């Protein structure tokens, strides 16, 4: 293609993504767009085509972003090239969303006609505004009996401040309004700005590992052209590679002769090691490099940490490889090796949130066949010592000696909870119970309220979301961002089994709740840990002070069964002998701790 043709082609490109709260019909809309533009034959069509991971389909959520090229012949007779970049809607995957938005010029905002705006919708809209995208509101599910498109229209205007007068009323499921949406994309989404003649700059927004071809980069070309045979250079580490193939996804990978400015596609360049490529990096040509890289993404810092240990210790290296491969297309996952006396060798991993942690654990077990034990999640605490030093600690077993600690600060998050009015009381009670501080409350419309709290991240980390859903019959939606560190009265609680500390069961708790939390846990462990041949005391301790204790009674054989009648001293002799045996056993015996015990420390609530 000559220059003229390339420039003409660029004017016909539209890059957009679809943003929505969970279950507002994002993946279904993507399916309809694929069908309407005949990108996918009816034979290959399946619901939620872009959610290719089994886990995504089962949970009905989108985890990974996806990029697809479609051709659409508009009413003006021209053929346009659309790049649809699918994004996740869940709070833990905000990072994925920001990555896909950086590769677009426009965004379709899908809002459910019955439910209206939810917390997550807002969070994603702000991300889109940060990236200066053209936002097109669409009111979906208008065929539902409870749909009230006019109310939602005013909501979009009042809460987000977007002009919704031209918002398309659609139903992705019934296929209503799809054509209008496509026409609006042509009219409203700007063509990519970029210079075909400038040195190549392409943003890596994702990467996948292919056993045969190495690392495959998914890129959005900002300037210039890349074709097979070029020598490319990664700007963060200056490594160079030869391009073997470039192409696009029409869900399946299809090879092309070139990728030019505005294109979204993949580059395969036999990149062997996972460490070389970072999402957010800039690709340029080694022969004619760009002067400076594109500003990539802000590095996401993990909020939640947990230990992952293989149940079979010989799988340690497999676990490392699996984590490296997952890190490739999930740049927010971080891990480092750690050891535990109770669990052996494993990794300390950092996650963006609980769902993220869950999904990673499931992907490791499914895709890589590794059985895992996971310790209680914790957050990063700032510990100020008496000698003026301060340290960040994410693992409770690394906490310094309590006598050396001056103060401990913990992270607080600003939590936005959107909820129908009748549940406001329940939400406030839950937030108070989780040590939250009330900030403010606004009414979105007559019935829905946006409540904002400052809550310690540690309280949100394990079951806040579930509790919120159950106390509001599933109507609340929730979004949080880190706001600040505050000093708190925190203590480290150790659990002792048979007098020995189990490092993997230690956790950090607020002083005021320490006693009841300790009592709950020892009672819970008593139910879970199987009875041994000897008596096992379970104790919860803060420093050297035991705050709660319970005993697992010993299993014992009835040694008197063979004495029919007979002298009491004979019976006593047998019982004394048994007691001495149990005592000897107790001094050398060790206690097996089942996997549930580690998790029970988490799901602590008034059970």
UniProtKB/Swiss-Prot annotation:
Gene Ontology terms, cellular component aspect? plasma membrane
Q: What class of enzyme is it?
A: hydrolase
- Please indicate if the UniProt record lists Hydrolase as a keyword: yes
Annotated keywords: Cell membrane, GTP-binding, Hydrolase, Membrane, Nucleotide-binding, Protein biosynthesis
**Pfam families in the record:** EFG_C, GTP_EFTU, GTP_EFTU_D2, LepA_C
Q: Which InterPro entries match?
A: EF-4, EFG_III/V, EFG_V-like, EFTu-like_2, G_TR_CS, LepA_C_sf, LepA_CTD, LepA_IV
The EC number on file is 3.6.5.n1
Membrane topology term? Peripheral membrane protein
Catalytic activity entry: GTP + H2O = GDP + phosphate + H(+)
Gene3D superfamilies assigned: 3.30.70.240, Elongation factor 4, C-terminal domain (3.30.70.2570), Elongation Factor G (Translational Gtpase), domain 3 (3.30.70.870), P-loop containing nucleotide triphosphate hydrolases (3.40.50.300), Translation factors (2.40.30.10)
Under HAMAP family, the record lists: LepA
User: What functional role does this protein have?
Assistant: Required for accurate and efficient protein synthesis under certain stress conditions. May act as a fidelity factor of the translation reaction, by catalyzing a one-codon backward translocation of tRNAs on improperly translocated ribosomes. Back-translocation proceeds from a post-translocation (POST) complex to a pre-translocation (PRE) complex, thus giving elongation factor G a second chance to translocate the tRNAs correctly. Binds to ribosomes in a GTP-dependent manner.
> Belongs to which family?
Belongs to the TRAFAC class translation factor GTPase superfamily. Classic translation factor GTPase family. LepA subfamily.
- Which PANTHER family has this protein been placed in? TRANSLATION FACTOR GUF1 HOMOLOG, CHLOROPLASTIC, TRANSLATION FACTOR GUF1-RELATED
Q: What name does this protein carry?
A: Elongation factor 4
- Species name for this entry? Streptococcus pneumoniae serotype 19F (strain G54)
Q: Which gene encodes it?
A: lepA
């Amino acid at each position: 293609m000559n220059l003229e043709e390339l420039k003409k082609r660029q004017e016909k490109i539209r890059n957009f993504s679809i943003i929505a709260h969970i279950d507002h019909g994002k993946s279904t809309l993507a399916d309809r767009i694929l069908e309407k533009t005949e990108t996918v034959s009816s034979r290959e069509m399946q619901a939620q085509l872009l959610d290719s991971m089994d886990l995504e389909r089962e949970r009905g959520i989108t985890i990974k972003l996806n990029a697809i090229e479609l051709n659409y012949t508009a009413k003006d007779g021209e053929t346009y090239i659309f790049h649809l970049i699918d994004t996740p809607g869940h709070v833990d995957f905000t990072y994925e969303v920001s990555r896909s938005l950086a590769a677009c010029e426009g965004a379709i905002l899908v809002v459910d006609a019955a439910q209206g705006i939810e917390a997550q919708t807002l969070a994603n809209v702000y991300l889109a505004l940060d990236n200066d995208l053209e936002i097109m509101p669409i009111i979906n599910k208008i065929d539902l009996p409870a749909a009230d498109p006019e109310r939602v229209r005013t909501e979009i205007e009042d809460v987000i401040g977007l002009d919704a007068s031209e918002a398309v009323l659609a139903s992705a499921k019934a296929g209503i309004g799809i054509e209008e949406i496509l026409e609006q994309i042509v009219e409203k989404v700007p063509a990519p700005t970029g210079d075909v003649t400038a040195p190549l700059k392409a943003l890596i927004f994702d990467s996948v590992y292919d056993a045969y071809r190495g690392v495959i980069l998914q890129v959005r070309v900002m300037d210039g052209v890349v074709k097979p045979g070029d020598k490319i250079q990664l700007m963060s580490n200056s490594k160079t590679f030869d391009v073997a193939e470039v192409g696009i996804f029409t869900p399946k990978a299809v090879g092309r002769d070139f990728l030019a400015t505005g294109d979204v596609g993949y580059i395969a360049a036999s990149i062997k090691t996972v460490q070389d490529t970072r999402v957010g990096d800039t690709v340029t040509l080694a022969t004619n490099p760009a002067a400076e890289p594109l500003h990539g993404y802000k590095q996401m810092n993990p909020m939640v940490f947990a230990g992952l240990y293989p149940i079979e210790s010989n799988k340690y290296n497999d676990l490392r490889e699996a984590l490296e491969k997952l890190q490739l297309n999930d740049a927010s996952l971080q891990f480092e090796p750690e050891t535990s006396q109770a669990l052996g060798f494993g990794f300390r991993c950092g996650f963006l949130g609980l769902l993220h942690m869950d999904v990673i654990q499931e992907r490791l077990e499914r895709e890589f066949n590794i059985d895992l034990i996971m310790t209680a999640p914790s957050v990063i605490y700032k510990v100020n010592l008496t000698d003026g030093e301060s340290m960040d600690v994410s693992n409770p077993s690394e906490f310094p000696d309590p006598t050396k600690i001056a103060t401990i600060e913990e992270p607080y998050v600003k939590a936005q909870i959107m909820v129908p009015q009748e549940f406001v009381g329940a939400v406030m009670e839950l937030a108070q119970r989780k040590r939250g501080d009330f900030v403010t409350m606004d009414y979105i419309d007559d019935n829905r309220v946006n409540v904002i709290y400052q809550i310690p991240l540690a309280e949100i980390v394990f079951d806040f979301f579930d509790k919120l859903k159950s106390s509001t019959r599933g109507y609340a939606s929730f979004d949080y961002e880190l706001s600040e560190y505050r000093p708190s009265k925190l203590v480290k609680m150790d659990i002792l089994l048979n007098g020995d500390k189990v490092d993997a069961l230690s956790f950090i708790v607020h002083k005021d709740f320490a006693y009841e939390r300790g009592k709950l846990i020892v009672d819970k462990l008593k139910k879970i840990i199987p009875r041994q041949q000897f008596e096992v005391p379970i104790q919860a301790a803060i420093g050297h002070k035991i705050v709660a204790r319970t005993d697992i009674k010993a299993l014992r054989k009835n040694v008197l069964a063979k004495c029919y009648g007979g002298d009491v001293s004979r019976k006593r002799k047998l019982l004394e002998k048994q007691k001495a045996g149990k005592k000897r056993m107790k001094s050398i015996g060790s206690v097996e701790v089942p996997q549930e015990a580690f998790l029970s420390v988490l799901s602590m609530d008034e059970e």
